[in-house]
């Protein structure tokens, strides 16, 4: 059994549905300390289980190189989404079948973290400083995870030169895509207050629905942009409409809706929120925005070339630089240093029978080792 495969099995076998704490971090620590890493673990969040403030465990590990050497960071998350029903094997009992390893987190992203650990075993300490930024809160609210790790790093004066996040970016085969950026995301809750009444006496009531319809119509037709060189066009989607009204003959007292905007770097979360608030207020409504991330772009250059060269050397293919897809914790790490995402094939992430090709684990480990070596010698 390869070392990367063994590490992946150990991590998968430690259940860690978001927010993650405990055993899976014990495994991670047990893997890193024999490789010379100093491991610091801490918990943030003091709320009840199931709430956004539920406790989250985080891990920062560092192996110092010579004084003045470069610092390269690996980042990722050990929490996983709930497994759901219908698996053909137990989701937290890793199982080899044919060429695949099955288990929740196999590709998102315990498999990639296993490859990172295996990779650093093949990078000599004298090459430079390597760290791990690992959270148990990426699949959930992401309030007490990577943000808290960044706060810790800043308090300790720790600043990597480059960071690679192990999200499953590959599409059809390992190495065909890396993420050099991501669009931003803002969710906005809309509300219009009315006056409840009988439908036969509309003059004694105030129907909030026509105003909500006008708000949503204007938002749905709002021109955003046509995209940029690296980003697809921004899009606004109506994701929820709700009227707490179960009777057919009652004019409701309130109408609620929610929209979600994924936006490129021609906007900011604040600028879009301002537009939506103005439209809502024009029609007598209110808007409450929650910005979950700003767009970021690590423009193609030295870092992306390092990754491309490593992928080419191990797979003979050229990875496509892309900014498609959802948000990740790279949106927080961008404030620390240049960051790029690269990892396993994503076809089975968040699905039942999540699985990774075992050969890909060894290949990804070698790619990560090449990237780390190149980053530390740059």
Swiss-Prot record:
Active site: 79, 138 (proton acceptor)
Sorted UniProt keywords: Amino-acid biosynthesis, Cobalt, Diaminopimelate biosynthesis, Hydrolase, Lysine biosynthesis, Metal-binding, Zinc
GO MF annotations, alphabetized: acetylornithine deacetylase activity; cobalt ion binding; succinyl-diaminopimelate desuccinylase activity; zinc ion binding
Catalytic activity: N-succinyl-(2S,6S)-2,6-diaminopimelate + H2O = (2S,6S)-2,6-diaminopimelate + succinate
Cofactor binding remark: Binds 2 Zn(2+) or Co(2+) ions per subunit.
Coiled-coil ranges per UniProt: none
Pfam families in the cross-refs: M20_dimer, Peptidase_M20
UniProt subunit comment: Homodimer.
Record protein name field: Succinyl-diaminopimelate desuccinylase
Organism, as annotated: Erythrobacter litoralis (strain HTCC2594)
Lineage: Bacteria, Pseudomonadati, Pseudomonadota, Alphaproteobacteria, Sphingomonadales
């Amino acid at each position: 059994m390869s070392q990367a495969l063994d590490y992946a099995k150990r991590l998968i076998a430690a259940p860690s549905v978001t927010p993650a704490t405990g055993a899976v971090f014990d495994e991670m620590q047990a893997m890193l300390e024999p490789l010379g890493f100093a491991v610091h673990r801490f918990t943030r969040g003091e709320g009840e289980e199931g709430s956004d403030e539920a406790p989250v465990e985080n891990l920062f590990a560092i192996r110092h190189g010579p004084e003045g050497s470069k610092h390269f960071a690996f980042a990722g998350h050990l929490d996983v989404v709930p497994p759901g029903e219908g698996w053909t094997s137990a989701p937290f009992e890793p199982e080899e079948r044919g060429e695949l390893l099955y288990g929740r987190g196999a590709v998102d992203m315990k498999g990639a973290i296993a490859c990172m650990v295996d990779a650093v075993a093949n990078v000599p300490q004298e090459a430079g400083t390597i760290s791990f930024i690992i959270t148990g809160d990426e699949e959930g609210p992401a309030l007490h995870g990577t943000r808290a790790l960044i706060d810790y790093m800043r308090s300790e004066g720790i600043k990597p030169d480059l960071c690679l996040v192990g999200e499953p970016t590959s599409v059809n085969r390992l190495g065909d895509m890396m993420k050099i950026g991501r669009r931003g995301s803002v969710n906005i809750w809309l509300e219009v207050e009315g006056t409840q009444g009988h439908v036969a006496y509309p003059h004694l009531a105030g129907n909030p629905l026509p105003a909500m319809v006008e708000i949503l119509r204007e938002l749905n037709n709002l021109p955003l942009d046509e995209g940029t060189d690296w980003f697809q066009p921004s899009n606004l989607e109506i994701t929820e409409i709700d009227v707490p009204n179960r009777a057919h003959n009652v004019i409701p007292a309130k109408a609620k809706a929610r929209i979600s905007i994924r936006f490129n770097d021609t906007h900011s979360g604040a600028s879009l929120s301002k537009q939506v608030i103005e439209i809502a207020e024009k029609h007598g409504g209110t808007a409450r925005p929650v910005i979950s991330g700003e767009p970021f772009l690590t423009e193609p250059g030295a870092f992306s070339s390092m990754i491309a060269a490593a992928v080419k050397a191990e797979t003979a293919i050229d990875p496509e630089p892309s900014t498609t897809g959802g948000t990740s914790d790279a949106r927080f790490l961008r404030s620390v240093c240049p960051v790029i995402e690269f990892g396993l094939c994503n076809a089975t992430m968040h699905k039942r029978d999540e699985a990774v090709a075992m050969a890909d684990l060894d290949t990804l480990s070698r790619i990560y080792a090449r990237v780390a070596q190149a980053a530390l010698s740059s």
